[in-house]
Amino acid sequence: MAKRGGFPGGNMPGNMNNLMKQAQRMQKQMEDKTKEMEEKQWEATAGGGAVTVTVSGKKEVVSVKLSKEVVDPDDIEMLEDLIVAATNEALRKMEEESASAMNSIAGGLGNFGGLGGLF
C-alpha cells in the first residue's frame, strides 16, 4: 500500500524546521518574560496620594498604604472607593506593561493563525 501525504523519511522541509525552531525560541522568550514580569511590582495612588497600592506581576496586592488624613470613621465608603481605584490603576499598569512586553516578542507573528491579538 502506497504511503500518502507526509514527507519522505518523515523529515520536515527546511522552512518548516526553521519555523519550529523560531516558535520554540519565541516560547522560551515568552516564558522568560512572564517570569520577569511576575517578579516586578507596580504602584498607583488615589486621592492625591492618600492611598497607595502596590501589586505584583502575579496580580496580587503586595501593600496598601493609607495617609492618616484619609482615615475617617464617618466616611469609610470614601476610603473603600480610594482603595479600589488605586488597586485597579495598579493592575491596569501591570496589564499594560505585560501586554506590551508580550507584543514585542510575538509582534513578528502579525495575525499568524489568529494568534496576533492574544498578547
Curated annotation (Swiss-Prot):
<comment type="function">
    <text>Binds to DNA and alters its conformation. May be involved in regulation of gene expression, nucleoid organization and DNA protection.</text>
</comment>
<dbReference type="InterPro" id="IPR036894">
    <property type="entry name" value="YbaB-like_sf"/>
</dbReference>
<dbReference type="GO" id="GO:0005829">
    <property type="term" value="C:cytosol"/>
</dbReference>
<feature type="compositionally biased region" description="Basic and acidic residues">
    <location>
        <begin position="28"/>
        <end position="42"/>
    </location>
</feature>
<keyword id="KW-0963">Cytoplasm</keyword>
<comment type="subunit">
    <text>Homodimer.</text>
</comment>
<feature type="region of interest" description="Disordered">
    <location>
        <begin position="23"/>
        <end position="45"/>
    </location>
</feature>
<keyword id="KW-0238">DNA-binding</keyword>
<dbReference type="Pfam" id="PF02575">
    <property type="entry name" value="YbaB_DNA_bd"/>
</dbReference>
<comment type="similarity">
    <text>Belongs to the YbaB/EbfC family.</text>
</comment>
<dbReference type="GO" id="GO:0003677">
    <property type="term" value="F:DNA binding"/>
</dbReference>
<dbReference type="InterPro" id="IPR004401">
    <property type="entry name" value="YbaB/EbfC"/>
</dbReference>
<protein>
    <recommendedName>
        <fullName>Nucleoid-associated protein Cphy_0047</fullName>
    </recommendedName>
</protein>
<dbReference type="GO" id="GO:0043590">
    <property type="term" value="C:bacterial nucleoid"/>
</dbReference>
